[in-house]
Amino acid sequence: MEKFQIYLELDGSQQHNFLYPLLFREYIYALAQDHGLNRSTISLENGGYDNKSSSLSGKRLITLLYQQIHLSISANDSNPNQFIGHNNNLYSQMILEGFAVIVEIPFSLQLVSFLEGKEMAKSQNFQSIHSIFPFFEDNFSHLNYVLDVLIPHPIRPEILVQTFRYWVKDASSLHLLRFFLHEYFNWNSLITPKKSISGFSTSNPRFFLFLYNSHVYEYEFLFFFLRNQSSHLRLTSSGVLLERIHFYGKVDYFVEVFANGFQDILWLYKDLFMHYVRYQGKAILASKDTPLLMNKWKYYFVNLWQWHFHVWSQPVRAHINHLHKDSINFLGYLSSRRRNPLVVRSQMLENAYLIDNAMKKFETAVPIIPMVESLTKARFCNPLGNPISKPIWADSSDSHIIDRFVRICRNLSHYHSGSSKKKSLYRIKYILRVSCVKSLVRKHKSTVRVFLKRLGSEFFQDFLTEEEHVLSLIFSRASFTWRRLYRGRVWYLDIICINDLVNHDKF
């Protein structure tokens, strides 16, 4: 990031967030082709990239774009989007990629200033997805209720333009953003890219993520402000603060008026034990309070989205779960708090009394039904969970078929290694093993018994992870000890995500 900082510094006219002139900068298109501001593989001093990335080409692209739009409008074409609508259009695609880099500059400058003079801790497991579960076990074990909210997405592109207006005051950039959104945009396909009609979300994932995160950040900004100030403000009186233009000036004025005339109607509405987590288009709000208060927060979210962001949302999109009775689906796990407390025996000093401490255990189990549904969509089994063959892989070699099954099985084993109950994971691994055997049997036109007899027991050893294989050799003679150890919860913190079974269209 430091090597690009000199290129991100704006001149006098751009210090007011005038980003439109950056479209004519050569390095913007070089950064767009590199698909990242923090990669070290690109050298801006090297002029090795082709002529498409030059500043003169950028000017020509914009000129040709507007000329074609003018010709389409003047000719009164029945399909005015024929120039913009094609995914393979070079002009609009390159400008949009460059614009995606430009709109990130204000946020990148804030990140650089924030990290200036600070040394980041280097750790291989710093971004591990499993670092979230210790947070759940430490903080959610003493909570009672969880509000599971499905974050709605805006159906009007103009809402995103208004959100972006809070960060950038450049009218030209706002008009260009509005143009791209109205020509390309199909927001219903952003959350589910498989149902995409236009090529916006699939061909421009970087721009999509920026718009979605900026939209979610706005509602979270208001939520955190009102949540922190809820002990001083009435919920019905805080509507004047929702507009972000001159936000802090309105806050100062409102606090002054509130201190003079509304001190007698304070409404205590603050929860010190509340935790908020957002992931994959959903949000979790956990609290120790009563269901009545959680129900108030539920309708608060609905009213905030409908009346301020003009986004349609229904109360049924938010579910209140009791951690003692219900489970929450979080990142591929079914998490819940165990009813029976876990007793931990401790001893402070030698020859002292033994103390039994009752602790509430937070369990994370593998959701068997969603996993079987995923395997069914990928055609590894039928809806009942019975393994079937994979005929689409019949043209591959035997080693390639086995490697693909083993890779999926190992990834699932690593990802769900920390589950408190392994029985569901054993069922999933069994489906993949038998599906692999049936795929090979169908390819060679043989039977399962004959095929397994020819391969031997070494065939199933490939499905074991490296950790399982080592432990099975160590505890091969002590089956009880090995079985008890394998049932324990072991997190493999180098696993970031499952990249095989998430996208079903790969199979």
Curated annotation (Swiss-Prot):
Q: Which UniProt keywords apply?
A: Chloroplast, mRNA processing, Plastid, RNA-binding, tRNA processing
Q: Spell out the molecular function terms from Gene Ontology.
A: RNA binding
Identify one Gene Ontology CC term for this UniProt entry: chloroplast
Pfam families xref list: Intron_maturas2, MatK_N
- In which compartments does the protein localize? Plastid, Chloroplast
Primary residence:
plastid
GO annotation (BP), single: RNA splicing
Q: What does this protein do?
A: Usually encoded in the trnK tRNA gene intron. Probably assists in splicing its own and other chloroplast group II introns.
Entry-linked HAMAP family: MatK
PANTHER family according to UniProt:
MATURASE K (PTHR34811:SF1)
Per its record, how is this protein called by name?
Maturase K
What gene does the UniProt entry assign to this protein? matK
